[in-house]
A protein has these predicted regions:
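N-terminal helix-turn-helix DNA-binding core of bacterial DNA-binding proteins
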Residues: 57, 67, 71, 75-117
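N-terminal leader segment of winged-helix/HTH proteins
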Residues: 1-7, 11-84
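Alpha-helical linker/hinge and terminal dimerization helices associated
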Residues: 73, 114, 157-173, 190-197
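C-terminal ligand-sensing/allosteric alpha-helical core of TetR-family HTH transcriptional regulators
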Residues: 58, 62-77, 153, 164, ...
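Charged, amphipathic alpha-helical coiled-coil/dimerization segments
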Residues: 126-185
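Short, hydrophobic-biased segments on the C-terminal half of alpha helices
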Residues: 107, 125-126
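Exposed, interaction-prone assembly regions rather than primary DNA-binding/catalytic cores
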Residues: 181-212
Length: 212
């Protein structure tokens, strides 16, 4: 499914294609990966105007930058994963299953770990199952539950996709490793305040390990 931005008539603004991505609560519309090549930074320009009209613009500029960064990264990651027949959401599910002890997890737990709505989990697993990367089987610990289990083909695809993402540093090649750790820590505070998790002995508190 491809939607188009309004416009595109002769003399009007050019249309821009959008790529779908499986995300919680539905499908985000993600702009295709194409440099805008603007002669100025639109977020910085908006911040200047904001300062004149409303006051401190730092929160607005930070949020707007995060939202734009998400668009850029999702487009970049999906472009890297497209040759493997995956979106980033489906890749996350495959990796989660690979991380599990037996390569299988209850659907409910997949939703919790990926922090997505149950409907999104169903859609993701449906796609992976149709590709032969995941199978479903009854959960022996819960007569009404279902397990999603990664297949041998799913493990192979996940391994190849991971190699490509690692080579591209997940689209974050413009940052040093220490800067990535700092970014994780800063955004972790936002997630903590939103109630994503309860800090404790099992939760990392210093950010991801960094190879030097």
């Amino acid at each position: 499914m491809v939607s188009r931005q309004a416009g595109g008539a002769r003399g009007g603004p050019r249309r821009r294609a959008w790529l779908p991505a499986d995300r919680p609560g539905g499908r985000y519309l993600v702009p295709v990966r194409k440099p805008l090549d603007l002669p100025f930074d639109p977020i910085a320009r908006a911040a200047q105007i904001w300062e004149r009209r409303f006051g401190d613009s730092r929160a607005m500029a930070a949020v707007t930058s995060i939202m734009r960064a998400q668009q850029i990264l999702i487009a970049e990651l999906d472009a890297l994963l497209r040759p493997h027949g995956l979106t980033f959401a489906r890749y996350e599910a495959l990796v989660l299953l690979r991380f599990s002890r037996e390569g299988a997890l209850p659907m409910r737990l997949i939703g919790q770990r990926l922090m997505v709505h149950p409907t999104s989990v169903t859609n993701i697993i449906n796609r992976l199952e149709a590709q032969g990367l995941v199978v479903r089987r009854p959960n022996p610990a819960d007569g009404r539950g279902t397990l999603a289990e990664i297949t041998a083909a799913g493990r192979e695809v996940a391994a190849r996709a991971t190699a490509d993402l690692m080579a591209a540093r997940f689209g974050m090649g413009g940052y040093r490793t220490d800067e990535l750790g700092q970014l994780f820590t800063l955004l972790r505070g936002l997630r903590l305040a939103a109630g994503d998790f309860t800090p404790g002995p099992a939760a990392a508190t210093t950010g991801p390990a960094v190879s030097r």
